[in-house]
Amino acid sequence: MELKKTKNGTHYIDNVKFMDLIRITDNCCPICDCCRKDLIGYNDLILVPILNEVYCKECGKKELKQIKYYEEDREIEERRTSYYCDVLGIEE
């Protein structure tokens, strides 16, 4: 797993494993927040902290191209990103 940024500066976490997602959300049947596909068995998920959403790789690539950065959301994004990095063991 790796913390990354889009070209416009929005944080996202790449290559999240479905078991880690289950562990941090207590949701035993995670689905893509875009296409609603079952994510069991996927180890290349994309998590977007500011949205509290996770996507399959296909949808994640599309969503990251469309996502807009809002300066007024910076504090919220930083808190959520820190939270997810902490629970997933990712260095910021």
Kindly label every feature range from the protein language model.
Residues 33-38, 72-75:
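Cys/His-coordinated Zn2+-binding motifs and related Cys/His-dense segments, i.e., zinc fingers/knuckles
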Residues 43-53:
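Short linker/helix segments within small regulatory modules
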Residues 40, 55-57:
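Zinc-coordinating Cys/His ligand positions in small cysteine/histidine-rich zinc-finger domains
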Residues 41-42, 65:
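Short, non-ligating residues that shape and space the ligands of small metal-coordination modules
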Residues 1-28, 65-92:
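Short, intrinsically disordered terminal segments enriched in charged and Pro/Gly residues
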Residues 32, 42-43:
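Glycine-centered loop/turn motifs
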Residues 60-64:
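A short, charged, amphipathic alpha-helix used as a generic interaction element across diverse proteins
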Residues 29-35, 48, 56:
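Short cysteine-rich clusters marking metal-coordination/redox-active sites
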